[in-house]
Amino acid sequence: MLYVVDHPLIKHKLTIMRKKETGPKEFRELLREITLLITYEATRHIPVYELEVETPLEKTKGYYINDKDIVVIPILRAGLGMVDGILELLPNASVGHIGIYRDPETLKAVDYYFKTPKLHDKSEIFILDPMLATGVSAIDAITKVKELGGKQITFISLISSPEGVKAIEKAHPDVNIYTASLDRELNDHGYILPGLGDAGDRLFRTK
């Protein structure tokens, strides 16, 4: 299911990211901040456990989350820019990495790196990629995570295309998608319109 996190702060920050004159330093900071804000909504489903705590006045019931069961997996390379944002809220989460790029000619996924912590049916897994375009890389990543035993999977992006959302919903209907914006469409090269360009290039200043 798709969840568009519609919040004034996110709209404001995403607009700055879209501007072509926004430099890499500000782009990185905004990506981290928006990821943090989306994470707030994307973690509503995770379980909480009771414990007793003592205030300066009396004992009372409290709650905690076991963030050691949480696994954050960025899709390289642009997904790396989202990791710090989610770790600010979940500092004990494990971090894996999936290296996938989309062949510009065939638009098919090409895998080149895969390293994750041990996954099990109680792992709360968050796959990160700023741009959900064709959905090819996302579907490939989700499929591999499931093959390793992952069941509770959430996909977090900054901007999504209708085509990418439909592709994930068809291939993995059990995966929830959280995004800051559902943009209009893909162009002939598989880029999201209006989008914000190549997130990886803008993040790492490679063009």
From Swiss-Prot:
Cofactor binding mode and count: Binds 1 Mg(2+) ion per subunit. The magnesium is bound as Mg-PRPP.
Catalysis performed (reactions): UMP + diphosphate = 5-phospho-alpha-D-ribose 1-diphosphate + uracil
GO BP annotation list: UMP salvage; uracil salvage
Enzyme Commission number(s) of this protein: 2.4.2.9
Gene Ontology molecular-function annotations: GTP binding; magnesium ion binding; uracil phosphoribosyltransferase activity
Recorded metabolic or biological pathway in which this protein acts: Pyrimidine metabolism; UMP biosynthesis via salvage pathway; UMP from uracil: step 1/1
EC class (word): transferase
Xref: NCBIfam families: PRK00129.1, upp
SUPFAM superfamilies per UniProt: PRTase-like
Protein known as: Uracil phosphoribosyltransferase
Amino-acid positions noted as binding uracil in the UniProt annotation, renumbered to this chain: 192, 197-199
Organism: Fervidobacterium nodosum (strain ATCC 35602 / DSM 5306 / Rt17-B1)
Similarity comment text for this entry: Belongs to the UPRTase family.
Domain of life (superkingdom): Bacteria
Cofactor entry: Mg(2+)
Primary role: Catalyzes the conversion of uracil and 5-phospho-alpha-D-ribose 1-diphosphate (PRPP) to UMP and diphosphate.
Keyword terms of this UniProt record: Allosteric enzyme, Glycosyltransferase, GTP-binding, Magnesium, Nucleotide-binding, Transferase
Ligand binding (5-phospho-alpha-D-ribose 1-diphosphate): 77, 102, 129-137, 198
Regulation: Allosterically activated by GTP.
